[in-house]
Amino acid sequence: MNPYNLSYDELEKKAKAIRRKIVVLNANSPAGGHTGADLSQVEILTSLYFRVLNNDPKDLINPERDIYIQSKGHGAGGYYCCLAEAGYIPEDWLPTYQHSDSKLPGHPVKHKTPGVELNTGALGHGLPVAVGLAIAAKKSGSKRKIYVLTGDGELGEGSNWEAALTAAQYKLDNLIIINDKNKLQLAGFTKDILCTDPLDKKWEAFGMEVHECQGNDIRSVVDTLESIQPNGKPHVVIANTTKGAGISFIEGRPEWHHKVPKGDEVELALEELKDE
């Protein structure tokens, strides 16, 4: 079970605290960051780490722990902020993000950061590995679940769809794929670069059980994830999000894919994220 199991209100407060960490972390990075991608995933990560995952930071080698894979590796900054808030890594590591010899590199690296299960960043790799882990869990009789978060533009990588076919073939109902559908990627709007809509129909055609939620609404995310039951099919949650969610001048702005807040922007963002 989850060691925190927070209420909806408590999860909302955690999400806001993680967003504040994201602002400061990116502002202090010597090598830029991915502020928009970090922010769009916050409610998803918060729901998983503080309510849904059977994963304890004090027992990282438990063979029955649920596995979470951050396939959208460019969202590493937000991922680290969540790991710090949840007690997987020390808070004082966050100011070292992307510094030389840091344990928090620009994309997740398993042997450097406690809690990270897979090196990611080259898009389209996380889901295939998650499928392999789900197959292994089935074969060994494990009850663990495998969760993987994919980006929106990431679904343009064909390896995801090969993995989906395999997941359906092996009836991996212990696999939960979450799409952070924020409608943007590095070069602009996903629909203008390589449109994957209607995404629900595509996943269904590949043999998935499809769920949908408002990905920046804690209650919607939690209720959707907790409603998933084994039924012989892999599960996909299309989480409709806003890139840069939570900060008005970042939301839905393509330039914030690789931009970080500076100067007055930091103060403005933190002002918007104050506890009420």
Curated annotation (Swiss-Prot):
Coiled coil: none
Cofactor(s), names only, from the UniProt record: thiamine diphosphate
Keyword terms of this UniProt record: Carbohydrate metabolism, Thiamine pyrophosphate, Transferase
Entry GO MF terms: transferase activity
CDD domains named among the record's database cross-references: TPP_TK
EC number: 2.2.1.13
Catalytic activity: apulose 4-phosphate + D-glyceraldehyde 3-phosphate = D-xylulose 5-phosphate + dihydroxyacetone phosphate
Pathway recorded for this protein: Carbohydrate metabolism
Subunit structure: Probable heterodimer composed of AptA and AptB.
Family, as annotated: Belongs to the transketolase family.
Protein name, UniProt field: Apulose-4-phosphate transketolase subunit A
The organism of origin for this protein: Actinobacillus succinogenes (strain ATCC 55618 / DSM 22257 / CCUG 43843 / 130Z)
